[in-house]
Amino acid sequence: MLAAEGIRYSYGKGAPVLDGVSLRVESGQRVALSAPSGTGKTTLARVLAGYLAPDEGRVTIDGRPLPRRGVCPVQMIWQHPEAAVDPRMRLGRTLAEAGPVDRALVGGLGIRDEWMDRFPHELSGGELQRFCIARALAAEPRFVIADEMSTMLDALTQAQIWRFLMDEVERREVGLVFVSHSPALTERIATDIVEL
């Protein structure tokens, strides 16, 4: 179980963006974070994935803190994939960061072999996001955090990416926490909704 208990987080000396936030996510559960824009959904996603340390509270998996070294069992798929990859690294190498390249994973996401030798700026946002999803899943996470991962993509690419991710998290019994401003997407995917 992924648990956040009493999370408080502030940027600098400002007012807390998160204050006393708690939630629990079981394996196989699909939780939507819901709140108006600017109220801490992305911040909470980053705290859950271990990218930000809370000012107060803690994040645990099965009662233990997230590991500080090695591959984290919580993987995040960012809204802007170009910010999640090294712009000077070819994408095949980026994908291999998570371990051996799983051909079924690559094929299922529609990643073409010729894209492996390209740099991030040479692909569209949808193509690049496919690499980010493949890298997150290749790490064999127990939980995936998806922060508006399809917002900037066309409707067809959104549908393909979400269908693939849903099949994978179900097959692997991975817990999913996602942020989306689409009520239709939330209704279709979420097993639970957490209001911040």
Please give the residue ranges for each predicted region:
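A short, flexible loop at the N-terminus of ABC-type nucleotide-binding domains that lies
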Residues: 1-4, 8-20, 27
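Helix-to-loop junction immediately C-terminal to a conserved catalytic motif
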Residues: 49
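ABC ATPase NBD coupling module
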Residues: 63-75, 83, 89, 93
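Q-loop/switch helix immediately C-terminal to the Walker
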Residues: 80, 87-102
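Hydrophobic anchor residue at the start of the ABC signature
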Residues: 133, 145, 161
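Conserved catalytic motifs of ABC-family nucleotide-binding domains
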Residues: 140
